[in-house]
Every structure is written in C-alpha cells, then in structure tokens.
C-alpha cells in the first residue's frame, strides 16, 4: 500500500504516460530539481508536488480518501444498529434460552472469524472474492480514469488482504458493540430469567460446558453461574441466578466476540503499516527522470525544456522568495502559487521604472530569490528586458522569469515564445515556459 505522497507520484506517472496536460510542466519540474539535495524518492515526490501546482490531483486523492471514510462510517453505523436490532429481537421474551441467545449473538461472528483465519493460513487471495474498485465507478475524464487505475493496481498488491481484513474486523466490532449495548440496555430495564434446554447433553456435560465458557469471563471479573445454577436452570428460569447468567452473557460477548475481533483488527493494522510499499523506481518512467538528473550536459536541442542557469544559480532552499509581475497585472492574481513547489511572497506589480527601482533596492538589502512574471504573448522590448536584467542582478538568491500565457499553444504564441527564449538567453536570464504551452509543444513534437 502507498502513502498519500506516493499515491500522488503514481497518479502523476499514470497521467504523464497518457499525455495529460498538468498545471505544472513536468520537464521544468525535473530540471528545477537537478541540483537539489535529497534522496531520489524525496526528489520524485517533490517533483510530483511541483507538477500538481494547483493541487487538483492532491484534492482528488483527498476526496477519494474522504469518500472512502464516510462510506465506512455509513457501513459502521448500519452494522451497529443491525447488531442492536437483532439482539433486541432475540431478547424480546422475558424467559431466555441462554445458549440460543449466545449462539444468535456470537454464532455468525465466530463463523466469519474462522473463515478469515482459514483464508489467512491458506494464503487465499482475497482479491478474487471482492470486485476491484475500478469496477465500482465509471468516469470519462482522464484524472478519474487514472485514479481508478491507481487503486486497481493497489488492489492487486499482497498487502490488500490486511486492508480488507482491518475493514472487515472494524465493521464486525461495530456490530458486536451494537449487540453489547443492546444487551446491557435490556438487562438494565427488564427482568429476565435464563434457562437452557438440550436433548443430547446431560446435566454433567452442560455444567462442564458452562465452566469452560465461564473460565475467561470469570478471570476478568464477570459474575458467572455455578454448577447448582446450571442444573437448576434446565427448563426453569430462576430470578436469583439471573444476574450470574447475564454476567456470563455479557462476558462472553466481550471475551469471545469483541476481544478476538479487536486483536485481529490490531494485527491487520500493524501488518498493513509495515507492508507500506516504496516507489518502484525501476519503472521506465522513473528511470527516465533519474537519468535526466544524472546527465550533467543538456543538448542545445532541448533548451526550451530546461530552466536556464543564472548567476548566482537558482537553488531551491529556505531563502525568502518574492514574486513580482512586470508592466501589467495578470488576470490570475495567484499566478505564482506553487511555482517550483515554493511559497512565494506577492510583491505586486511593477508598472513603471520607479517601482522597479524600489524593488531593486529592496532586493539588494535582503538575500531573496525572485520570480518575475511577464506576458509571453507580448513581444519582448528593450525596456522590459532591461528591467529583468536589473532585478536578476539585484536578486542575491537568483531570479527566474515565468512566461505566462492565457491559452494553449498556437502559431502566434510559438513565434513569440521563440523571441522570448532568444532574448532571455542573450540576457543570461533563467526562465520557465508557460506550463500548458510547453507540454502541448512536446506532445506536438512526438
């Protein structure tokens, strides 16, 4: 089973292999993490967070998790009231057959627990008896299909037996708790008498059976009937012994119903926790990412897929991070959110030379990194390029230009992006391509 961060990585992989257009560019995220310290898995997780810049994928996974939780809540509530109602019906008469009530309360639970143990020791694949989550829903959008595939793949993992086991035990615990509450409530407000009947069992055999049944509850302090009460209880209800019989009933539910289920649930949760899988970094998709990080030289033909270096080079660290928009305000006021998986402080819009100069002075006083937003659909002029150079030189932590485009790739945008690439390269500035346009361009070239 995968934790939420690894689920996000796998979801990104599935979508990327299908040509999905993300809110963040996968290639730019890969290049941005080239010089970042950390283990390979940590960097791949961070890369997925950068690709999911608008958090849509994380929110989708969270909705699935929340939906599963509330589905369990509904099932648990139903199980509780089912157990409560069944027990209420079993104890509808004043004179109760003890063994009949006990069998009605614990019979099915004990049988299903035995079936689970048999499947466990026989190593039966429980996935054969349950439908895959991929068969429960149908969705046409790529994200929904990818989520279904993600959980279908997870369903085939060996550790799914512990997930199913923990869920089953938790629902049975709710059922048993409903039964216990019903028993306690009825014993509190009604006067019952207990008897027992048997055609085959003698008094001695019945006494022995009750002694064996009562051993554990008596050790835990529950009142239990003695041999005299057992013998006198045959076909007859005795109010004087009712408390002992009721104590044995409650103790049996606790000791032979709730306690074994609770232990089984704990075992499943522990084994589920210890069986958490790491990412399979041997998959071709991850190997391609790792090779890009290991490759120190980037071919000139792939220039638009990289984050160019500036002096000082941009290194993702804990330095203050500021974001500023040049010339005019962008329609998305949070255009900087999630860029390079960092939290950027909005410094507003620098619309004239005075505001650029003020920001330049502030940058020289604080070692901040700067994200500069410019409209990619405008032709780069000398004034804007001069402002970019001044701000990049003043940013002690480095600066990167984010080219912004309202729509996807078009012939006009492609031409203007090429002008921006040439101009920024001549200035020695780093830049990030428009996320959607960069991805559409690569898909078009494939």
Curated annotation (Swiss-Prot):
Its main location: membrane. GO terms for cellular component: membrane. The keyword Transmembrane helix applies. Keywords: Membrane, Transmembrane, Transmembrane helix. The chain crosses the membrane at residues 69-89, 98-118, 169-189, 247-267. It is found in: Membrane. Present in outer membrane vesicle formulations which are used as vaccines in human. This is Uncharacterized membrane protein NMB1645. It comes from Neisseria meningitidis serogroup B (strain ATCC BAA-335 / MC58).
């Amino acid at each position: 089973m995968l934790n939420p961060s690894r689920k996000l990585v796998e979801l990104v992989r599935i979508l990327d292999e299908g040509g999905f257009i993300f809110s963040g560019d996968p290639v730019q995220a890969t290049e941005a993490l080239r010089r970042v310290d950390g283990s390979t898995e940590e960097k791949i997780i961070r890369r997925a967070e950068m690709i999911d810049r608008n958090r849509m994928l994380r929110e989708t996974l969270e909705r699935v998790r929340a939906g599963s939780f509330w589905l369990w809540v509904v099932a648990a509530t139903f199980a509780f009231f089912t157990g409560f109602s069944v027990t209420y019906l079993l104890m509808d008469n004043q004179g109760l057959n003890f063994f009949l009530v006990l069998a009605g309360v614990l019979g099915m639970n004990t049988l299903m627990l035995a079936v689970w143990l048999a499947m466990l020791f026989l190593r039966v694949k429980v996935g054969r008896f349950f439908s895959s989550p991929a068969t429960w829903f149908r969705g046409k959008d790529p994200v929904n299909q990818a989520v279904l595939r993600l959980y279908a793949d997870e369903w085939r993992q060996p550790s799914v037996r512990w997930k199913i086991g923990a869920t089953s035990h938790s629902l049975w615990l709710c059922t048993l708790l409903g039964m216990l509450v019903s028993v306690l409530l009825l014993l509190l407000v009604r006067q019952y008498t207990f008897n027992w009947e048997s055609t085959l069992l003698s008094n001695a055999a019945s006494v022995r059976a009750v002694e064996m049944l009562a051993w554990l509850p008596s050790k835990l302090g529950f009142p239990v009937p003695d041999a005299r009460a057992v013998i006198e209880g045959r076909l007859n209800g005795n109010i004087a012994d009712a408390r002992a019989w009721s104590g044995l009933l409650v103790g049996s539910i606790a000791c032979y119903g709730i306690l074994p289920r609770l232990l089984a649930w704990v075992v499943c949760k522990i084994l589920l926790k210890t069986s958490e899988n790491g990412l399979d970094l041997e998959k071709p998709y991850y190997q391609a990412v790792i090779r890009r990080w290991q490759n120190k030289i980037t071919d000139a033909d792939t220039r638009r897929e990289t984050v160019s270096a500036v002096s000082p080079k941009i290194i993702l660290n804990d330095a203050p991070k500021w974001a500023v928009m040049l010339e005019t305000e962008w329609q998305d006021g949070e255009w900087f959110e999630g860029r390079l998986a960092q939290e950027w402080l909005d410094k507003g819009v620098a619309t004239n030379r005075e505001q650029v100069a003020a920001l330049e002075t502030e940058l020289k006083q604080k070692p901040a990194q700067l994200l500069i937003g410019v409209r990619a659909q405008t032709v780069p002029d000398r004034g804007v390029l001069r402002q970019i150079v001044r701000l990049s030189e003043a940013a002690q932590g480095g600066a990167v230009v984010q080219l912004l485009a309202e729509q996807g790739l078009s012939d006009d945008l492609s031409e203007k992006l090429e002008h921006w690439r040439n101009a920024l390269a001549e200035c020695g500035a780093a830049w990030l391509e428009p996320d959607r346009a960069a991805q559409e361009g690569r898909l078009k070239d494939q």
